């Protein structure tokens, strides 16, 4: 994750201080940023959010947009309760951090310059481990920015 430069030129180095840590995902930039309590950016990286339409479930599956809080975390053993559809779950979601209903931030081995998930925010495994173990705690604010208007 230290070599992943995605997002460094997109996210500002500082944002208004809130007194709380923040994780921000920008679907338009395929990137995330972590900000400390003082509003200083401490890390950025590549991310992939939910795609416009998921064939296997027959509906749109973009990541929910808005401001949320992490309410549950799991470690390397975390698995989906829904996907893949054909097995009604079991898909690996290492270092998952739940922020709204079933939406999580979790590790993935593919983090393309595209939004390709069923709604979760996928980040590189080393980034997910760092976020889960070193940065995000229960109550950390998660901000999902809007998708591009024409996508």
Question: Which residues are covered by each model-predicted region?
Answer:
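A structural motif detector for short, solvent-exposed N-terminal "entry" segments of globular domains
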Residues: 2-53
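Exported/periplasmic cell-wall-interacting domains
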Residues: 2-20, 58-67, 72-151
